[in-house]
Each structure stands twice: as structure tokens, then as C-alpha cells.
Curated annotation (Swiss-Prot):
Belongs to the TCTA family. It is a single-pass membrane protein. It is found in: Membrane. It comes from Danio rerio. InterPro entries: TCTA. PANTHER family: T-CELL LEUKEMIA TRANSLOCATION-ALTERED GENE PROTEIN. GO terms for biological process: osteoclast fusion. Keywords: Membrane, Transmembrane, Transmembrane helix. Residues 76-100 are annotated as: Disordered. The chain crosses the membrane at residues 35-55. This is T-cell leukemia translocation-altered gene protein homolog. Pfam families: T_cell_tran_alt.
Amino acid sequence: MEESWDFEFLSRMVDSLVSFLSEFVDDWLANDMRVAVFKILFSWLVVSLVAIHFAWKVYGNTVNDMYYRQGTGGQNGGTPDTHLSGWESAAGDAMKTHRE
């Protein structure tokens, strides 16, 4: 019983996709306004992805080094523990440490 429902659902999905594509091709050939907007947006997407790719090629190592820079304040080079504000250092609590 479920197999016929799956086939029917799949058949409807394929039919709707084919009808959408045929309508899109008709609009494309007629040079409809929706196609012009699609071309502009698709061109913007492609140009943006190419620009991101080239920017990553140029600045990728710098960004990676900034994220993983070595320092005394932890994994990402945060501020050291000696630069606590007045109320944090005045509390007098012992610093918590990680124990396994």
C-alpha cells in the first residue's frame, strides 16, 4: 500500500518539476521580465562566489593565523589572567583549574 503512495508522490513531484521547467524555458525564450531578474540574481551569485573564492585565496592564511594565533591567554590568544578587573581580583576566590 505504501509503495503505491510513494510512487504517486514521486510522480506528482516529477510532473510539477517538468511543468515548472517547461514554463521557465518558455519564459526564457520569450525573454520575460522574470527571466531577466533571474539572470541578474544568478550573475550576482556567481560573481559573489568567485570574489569570495579569490579573497579566500589571498587572505585565507591571514584569517587562519588570526584565529589560531599563539598567545598566553588560551586557544585563541585572549587576554592573560593577570589583567583581571578590580572586582574580579578583589573577590579573593581561588582560580579554578581543570583537573582530569
